[in-house]
Amino acid sequence: MSAPKKIVVLPGDHVGQEITAEAIKVLKAISDVRSNVKFDFENHLIGGAAIDATGVPLPDEALEASKKADAVLLGAVGGPKWGTGSVRPEQGLLKIRKELQLYANLRPCNFASDSLLDLSPIKPQFAKGTDFVVVRELVGGIYFGKRKEDDGDGVAWDSEQYTVPEVQRITRMAAFMALQHEPPLPIWSLDKANVLASSRLWRKTVEETIKNEFPTLKVQHQLIDSAAMILVKNPTHLNGIIITSNMFGDIISDEASVIPGSLGLLPSASLASLPDKNTAFGLYEPCHGSAPDLPKNKVNPIATILSAAMMLKLSLNLPEEGKAIEDAVKKVLDAGIRTGDLGGSNSTTEVGDAVAEEVKKILA
């Protein structure tokens, strides 16, 4: 029997505890029917919960445990309790991304089931068939650049910097993702090259990397503001792989996340290397936040469960089991078992139970 897969779980704040519990439930369901698949879960603090307990948003023991794990499963961080002071929950998330060199954030945007089309804010005839992955550069750019706070002089600034190797690295990730399909998916590179020097370097490097290393692929460049309009008007036009910088990726992926009808549906992966052997180290989390105002047992766990499916496929070399989770989610949604954000009346735990049972049936 192979050694158990070590997964560090960082529930975080508010609904983070609930959604990670449901993902773990589904993973344990796999072990129930596949004796050769075992998981070793190790919980640690991050975010506001870590600040309350230790004074810092990412304790050293949580970071060190994550470095030794096969993968990390994260819930959500933040909330109004911790405000915008000098020590904030989000700092823990930025630190773990940087320390683990999680340079590529993958955010799929598609419909887990066509039965959800009517829930999209976009008319079904335009939303149907939407299927793209945002590949966001995660450890560079303006979020990690030099900055100056307002120290009383009424001036504050942030700086955006990218290097050729950073852009090459994220371009290779986008190309790898495109080449997993036959025919290869188109690549869209989003920037602001008509204004920003960093975007001009970005565009030039993306173009040269694709041309020199992946000559069979095609990349099209789109200004970020234009892409934001296209995403609302005709989202399928951007089907394929979308590559963009840290801040632009943060914004465009949040815009995209409402297309399927709920933030509670979309997973994400943050990877430290190409998943060419399905064993890339990664951190997996839902695209939504900590939802501090949501009552207990009401949050949609699907995004976190699907994040666990991505983890199985990209980091733990368990693609069949990952696909089983995705198929189980579709069956559960088609059966009308849904939380309130999808027009249903089921609780968080009921949805998790249903997915876990479907996974067992599929893999039995």
Swiss-Prot record:
Manner of cofactor binding, per the entry note: Binds 1 Mg(2+) or Mn(2+) ion per subunit.
Gene Ontology biological process: glyoxylate cycle; L-leucine biosynthetic process
EC number: 1.1.1.85
Membrane-spanning intervals of the chain: none
Catalytic activity from the UniProt record: (2R,3S)-3-isopropylmalate + NAD(+) = 4-methyl-2-oxopentanoate + CO2 + NADH
Residues given in the record as substrate binding sites: 97, 107, 136, 225
Pfam families: Iso_dh
Assigned GO CC terms: cytosol
Gene3D superfamilies referenced in this protein's UniProt entry, alphabetically: Isopropylmalate Dehydrogenase (3.40.718.10)
Molecular function via GO: 3-isopropylmalate dehydrogenase activity; magnesium ion binding; NAD binding
SUPFAM superfamilies per record: Isocitrate/Isopropylmalate dehydrogenase-like (SSF53659)
Pathway this chain belongs to: Amino-acid biosynthesis; L-leucine biosynthesis; L-leucine from 3-methyl-2-oxobutanoate: step 3/4
Site entry: Important for catalysis: 143, 192
Keyword field contains rRNA processing: no
Residues engaged in binding Mg(2+): 225, 250, 254
Binding residues for NAD(+): 79-90, 289-300
Subcellular location: Cytoplasm
PROSITE patterns hit by this protein: IDH_IMDH (PS00470)
Keywords: Amino-acid biosynthesis, Branched-chain amino acid biosynthesis, Cytoplasm, Leucine biosynthesis, Magnesium, Manganese, Metal-binding, NAD, Oxidoreductase
Cofactor(s) needed by this chain: Mg(2+); Mn(2+)
Subunit structure: Homodimer.
Record PANTHER family: 3-ISOPROPYLMALATE DEHYDROGENASE
Function description: Catalyzes the oxidation of 3-carboxy-2-hydroxy-4-methylpentanoate (3-isopropylmalate) to 3-carboxy-4-methyl-2-oxopentanoate. The product decarboxylates to 4-methyl-2 oxopentanoate.
Family: Belongs to the isocitrate and isopropylmalate dehydrogenases family.
Stated name of the protein: 3-isopropylmalate dehydrogenase
